């Protein structure tokens, strides 16, 4: 919980990572090779974060993510109410194997799906490799968070096509498309009621404020991308700077900081 104008605001981070990396990705400096449940809980306590949605860290080499999915499911049980696990899937492995991993994740009790089209070398709207996963996700009522931005395979346009083709499937555009994609993501969200966006990675405040003003506070989720960004950065961006510029109501802050992700995950 954090205090805003005398009001207690619950905080649930909708975008975080756990696990261990085997090979270093060149763009991550300083290198983050391992971030486990204990590290997550410490970061949460330091930032006043009540809960997190978390999924496997990019492993740095081809993987089906089974091992980390299992670890996250175990952590979710150990820290019930604080850790909400998503399974990570690699569509590039083909639909047969990946659907099996998905069904295993459902049995583990994981609450959603994360896909990074760039790391997995698979366009977000791939009809043969991704759409069977979306059909299964929709069947099981699992929200899907796509990394959005930095490359054509993960473009807002491609993910928007998925959202249009699966209108009952909750889609989260991770990082809101980053700075270059924010406005396109907002336009998609205005047309597709199943599209949401998280705050992580939108470093230019005017664009982030536009996402709230144009798409509405019921479509924006607080997310940090921890451990790659400190949780406190995103909290301050929203509750201090965006609130000042937009004069957000406390009710709007509650939606962004926890209410929207609780609704998507059916957390009471």
Regions found by a protein language model. Name each.
Residues 1-14, 18, 23-51, 217, ...:
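Mid-to-C-terminal alpha-helical segments outside catalytic/metal-binding sites
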Residues 30-55, 62, 69-77, 103-107:
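Alpha-helical scaffold segments that flank or form the walls of functional sites
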Residues 19-21, 59-62, 92-94, 118-121, ...:
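Active-site environment of divalent metal-dependent phosphoester hydrolases
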Residues 11-16, 52-54, 84-88, 113-115, ...:
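Hydrophobic faces of well-ordered beta-strands that scaffold small-molecule active sites
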Residues 59, 63-143, 191, 195:
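Active-site gating/metal-coordination segments in enzymes
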């Amino acid at each position: 919980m954090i205090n805003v104008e005398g009001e207690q605001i619950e905080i649930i981070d909708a975008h975080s990572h756990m696990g261990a990396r085997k090979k270093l990705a060149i763009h991550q400096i300083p290198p983050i090779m391992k971030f486990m449940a204990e590290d997550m809980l410490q970061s949460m306590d330091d930032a006043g974060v009540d809960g997190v949605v978390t999924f496997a860290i990019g492993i740095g080499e081809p993987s089906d993510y089974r091992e980390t999915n299992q670890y996250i499911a175990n952590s979710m049980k150990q820290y019930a109410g604080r850790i909400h696990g998503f399974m990570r899937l690699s569509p590039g492995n083909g639909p047969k194997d990946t659907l099996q991993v998905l069904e295993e994740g459902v049995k583990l009790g994981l609450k959603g799906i994360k896909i990074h089209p760039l790391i997995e070398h698979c366009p977000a709207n791939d009809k043969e490799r991704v759409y069977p996963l979306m059909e299964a996700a929709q069947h099981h009522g699992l929200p899907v968070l796509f990394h959005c931005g930095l490359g054509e395979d993960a473009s807002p346009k491609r993910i928007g096509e998925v959202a249009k083709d699966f209108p009952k499937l909750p889609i989260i555009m991770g990082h809101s498309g980053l700075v270059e994609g924010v406005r396109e993501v907002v336009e998609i969200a205005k047309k597709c009621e199943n599209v949401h966006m998280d705050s992580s990675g939108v470093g230019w405040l005017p664009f982030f404020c536009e996402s709230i003003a144009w798409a509405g506070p019921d479509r924006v989720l607080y997310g940090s991308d921890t451990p790659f960004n400190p949780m406190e950065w995103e909290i301050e961006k929203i509750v201090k700077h965006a609130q000042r510029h937009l004069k957000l109501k406390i009710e709007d802050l509650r939606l962004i900081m926890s209410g929207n992700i609780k609704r998507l995950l059916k957390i009471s």
